[in-house]
Structure formats: structure tokens, C-alpha cells
């Protein structure tokens, strides 16, 4: 009986991030694409600035990587989020499931694991499909900083 009750509880509520299988870990990603927007770092302060410039491999409409399994071949600078390096990614969005679960918080109501699709996430405008621009179309990256520092205004 206890095993049946445990299986009724979603894995993200009964397991720690470290206990999850690779498939469970991957399924936490809501597919918003925010990780796939380029970030700029101030050379003097190490402050990170977010842009709306999409990685060349990001399909802006679907918010999915065109070559996810081979992304490091196409984009050597692509960063893989793991259980081990999660604490280093302070820039993860406040809505990120990895961040939320690491902080002991629940998944948002629009998360695909709860709704069964990405439609609610896109509807809440969490995904980048409404703001992202193609890297090939960008001339001045500073014009695309979303959290502009005072010196850039």
C-alpha cells in the first residue's frame, strides 16, 4: 500500500535532484529557451547581462535546440547544466524548475510536467519565443541587453 501511495507522488516531489534519473532530470526543463539566450559579462565587475539574442541552434518558434544531443559539436561554448554545477548558475531564471526545486519550492502551475504541454508556459510568456532575435541579425549586442546597466542607457 505504501508503495502505491509513493508512486502517486510525482518524482520531483519525492526525490532530490541528486536522486533523479537522467530522464527525470531532463524532463524538469520546461523548454523556455532562456538558457539559450546569450549573456554578456562585464570584464571589470563580472556582472552578467542578459540579452534577447538567441543561440544559433535555438529554434525560436519552438524554443528547442536544433541539435540538442550534439549541441556541443555545434556550439562549443554551450554550457551543460548538471547536478554538480547547478549552484554555479546563479543567473538561472526564477521560474527554472532546477532552481526552484534546489530552493525547496514547487513547480509553477504552468510547468509542462503539470499541464502536459508547453502551451501554458508559452501563454504565460515565460518562453523566449516572444522576445528572442536571431544572432545572425544582431549588429550591436549592447542594444539587446535586457537588464541594462546605467552606463548603457
UniProtKB/Swiss-Prot annotation:
Transmembrane segments: none annotated. It comes from the Bacteria. InterPro entries: Puta_zinc/iron-chelating_dom, UCP006173. Belongs to the UPF0260 family. NCBIfam families: PRK05170.1-1 (NF003498), PRK05170.1-5 (NF003501), PRK05170.2-1 (NF003503), PRK05170.2-5 (NF003507). This is UPF0260 protein YcgN. The lineage of its organism: Bacteria, Pseudomonadati, Pseudomonadota, Gammaproteobacteria, Enterobacterales. The gene is ycgN.
Amino acid at each position: 500500500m505504501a508503495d502505491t501511495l509513493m508512486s502517486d507522488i510525482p518524482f520531483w516531489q519525492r526525490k532530490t535532484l541528486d536522486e533523479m534519473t537522467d530522464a527525470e532530470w531532463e524532463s524538469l526543463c520546461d523548454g523556455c529557451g532562456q538558457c539559450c539566450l546569450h549573456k554578456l559579462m562585464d570584464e571589470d565587475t563580472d556582472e552578467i547581462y542578459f540579452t534577447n539574442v538567441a543561440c544559433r541552434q535555438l529554434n525560436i518558434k519552438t524554443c528547442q535546440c536544433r541539435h540538442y544531443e550534439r549541441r556541443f559539436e555545434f556550439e562549443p561554448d554551450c554550457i551543460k547544466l548538471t547536478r554538480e554545477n547547478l549552484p554555479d548558475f546563479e543567473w538561472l531564471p526564477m521560474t527554472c524548475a532546477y532552481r526552484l526545486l534546489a530552493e525547496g519550492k514547487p513547480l509553477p502551475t504552468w510547468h509542462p510536467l503539470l499541464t502536459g504541454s508547453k502551451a501554458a508556459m508559452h501563454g504565460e510568456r515565460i518562453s523566449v519565443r516572444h522576445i528572442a532575435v536571431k544572432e545572425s541579425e544582431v549588429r550591436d549586442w549592447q542594444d539587446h541587453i535586457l537588464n541594462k546597466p546605467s552606463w548603457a542607457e
